[in-house]
């Protein structure tokens, strides 16, 4: 009987993802993200976006830390573009108006610069002051529009704002208010659970229960789904894995993390991409960014950035 139990346990435990296979998956994905991020700046030179600027920067920085050769010129171009975008709106930030996307754009742009190692200046100080005052009565931040899955949750907007304000002395009360809101407000979707976990960690609050809630929604196939009635996809799986790892809720060799990695590698397309079907209603003019999957390319590159970053986190940092 004991032997049967041991065999059953061995059967259901995932094999550790092979480092060579992970590197191969990343090596196929990175060129697609790099190419598309370059094209997007040329096509939409007046607009910072998470899907073609912020998240690619996250991926490039993480890849560089793991010993991958990245296009350093493109990385600096993305960071310079973010600086210039915020600088164009500096007066609006000083007046409390912000830019399109409001707190979500402001917070994610500052997060992007932080990832890229850029230091504070007069423009970023204006943006942080805007975030401190914006939506203060809510005790959290929320996006101005509902564009699922990546721009619909108040938890994601709150996370990006907290990451930008956590070291700002003038934001102490705002951070305390947000911490209480996070502790008292339940998550409804995977996007909520992912960013509630990350935001609680950023707010230096206990995130143990939030991590458990996210882990409990992992599917039998190893992935996560955006909603209960949807199948597992690369966006939900990638965001969940990155948040769990970055908050210290799991280690790279934990079974849940390994199962998620396996799902990502099994569902990567032969060309190195991942395909996620868009749920957001288009409101901007369509343009071809060079990433596969046509009208689904914006959410697909978003998913690819999270998925690639999750795979990278399983690899050792190269000194």
Task: Show where each model-derived region lies.
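Bacterial N-terminal signal peptides
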Residues: 2-12
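Preference for long, amphipathic alpha-helical scaffolds in soluble/luminal domains
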Residues: 14-319
């Amino acid at each position: 009987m004991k032997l049967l139990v041991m065999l059953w346990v061995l059967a259901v435990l995932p094999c550790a993802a092979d480092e060579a296979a992970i590197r191969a998956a990343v090596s196929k994905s990175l060129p697609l993200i790099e190419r598309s991020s370059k094209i997007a700046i040329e096509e939409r030179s007046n607009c910072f976006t998470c899907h073609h600027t912020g998240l690619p920067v996250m991926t490039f920085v993480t890849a560089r830390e793991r010993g991958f050769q990245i296009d350093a010129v493109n990385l600096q171009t993305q960071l310079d573009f973010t600086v210039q975008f915020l600088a164009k709106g500096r007066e609006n930030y000083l007046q409390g108006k912000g830019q399109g996307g409001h707190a979500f754009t402001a917070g994610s742009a500052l997060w992007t610069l932080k990832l890229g190692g850029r230091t504070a200046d007069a423009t970023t100080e204006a943006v942080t002051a805007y975030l401190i005052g914006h939506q203060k009565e809510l005790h959290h931040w929320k996006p101005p529009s509902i564009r699922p899955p990546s721009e619909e949750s108040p938890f994601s907007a709150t996370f990006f704002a907290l990451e930008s304000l956590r070291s700002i002395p003038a934001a102490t009360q705002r951070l305390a208010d947000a911490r209480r809101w996070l502790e008292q407000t339940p998550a409804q979707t995977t996007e909520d659970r992912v960013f509630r976990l990350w935001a609680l960690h950023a707010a230096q609050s206990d995130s143990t229960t939030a991590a458990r809630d996210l882990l409990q929604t992992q599917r039998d196939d190893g992935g996560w789904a955006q909603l209960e009635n949807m199948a597992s996809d690369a966006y939900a799986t990638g965001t969940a894995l990155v948040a769990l790892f970055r908050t210290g809720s799991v280690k790279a060799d934990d079974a849940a993390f390994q199962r998620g990695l396996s799902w990502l590698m099994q569902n990567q397309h032969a060309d190195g991409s991942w395909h996620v079907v868009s749920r957001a209603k288009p409101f901007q003019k369509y343009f071809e960014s060079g990433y596969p999957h046509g009208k689904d390319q914006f959410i697909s590159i978003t998913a690819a950035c999270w998925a690639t970053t999750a795979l990278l986190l399983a690899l050792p940092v190269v000194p």
